[in-house]
């Protein structure tokens, strides 16, 4: 049936800024996905309300977190998605605090203890990173960190993308080469998903 959505993607913006470079990058990926008929939602961690992990280890016995906040809704949306993309800017050489706090709250899903919760099988993950610095090493560390998170959740990493030298919004928005490269990445991933 024409117009029917067979794949769903959840794109997670881990930047403290709602409308900065990370949002622009995810927007380009979302456009490419939508053009290929992939149902796409962008979720900004900055507007979600969740506390830090308490380290209480209750989830080691119950596979559930004792804290009730927006983490459960985020995980529900991840559970419903076929593809999950997480984008983080470089903050002091790594992922943002918002993303780290969310990852820590996913401890009920850690295979390091039994019982543990699990997302449905077959999900694919895309990691994206941005940095103000020109040195790509920090972006590569961000990508590796996100991919490790995916693997522990049973999500198969399928692609990653990074761009360096983007401190201000103009550094990305006024750089046709970087915009075209990011749009091309989104298009190629969308093609691979709907083969």
Task: Enumerate the language-model features and the residues they cover.
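Beta-strand-loop-alpha "switch" segments that mediate conformational coupling across diverse proteins
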Residues: 159-165
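Sparse recognition of residues in long alpha-helices and their boundaries
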Residues: 38, 115-118, 166
């Amino acid at each position: 049936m024409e117009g029917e959505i067979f794949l769903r993607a959840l794109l997670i913006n881990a930047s403290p800024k709602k409308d900065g470079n990370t949002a622009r990058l995810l927007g380009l990926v979302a456009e490419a996905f939508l053009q290929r008929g992939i149902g796409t939602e962008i979720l900004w961690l900055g507007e979600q309300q969740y506390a830090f992990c308490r380290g209480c280890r209750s989830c080691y016995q119950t596979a559930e977190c004792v804290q009730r906040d927006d983490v459960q809704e985020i995980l529900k949306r991840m559970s419903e998605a076929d593809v999950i993309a997480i984008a983080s800017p470089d903050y002091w050489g790594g992922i943002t605090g918002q993303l780290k706090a969310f990852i820590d709250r996913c401890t009920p899903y850690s295979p390091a203890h039994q019982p543990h919760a699990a997302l449905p099988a077959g999900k694919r993950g895309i990691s994206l990173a941005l940095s103000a610095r020109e040195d790509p090493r920090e972006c590569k560390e961000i990508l590796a960190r996100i991919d490790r998170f995916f693997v522990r959740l049973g999500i198969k990493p399928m692609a990653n993308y990074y761009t360096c030298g983007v401190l201000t919004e103009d550094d990305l928005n006024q750089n046709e080469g970087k915009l075209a490269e990011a749009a091309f990445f989104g298009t190629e991933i969308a093609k691979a998903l709907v083969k």
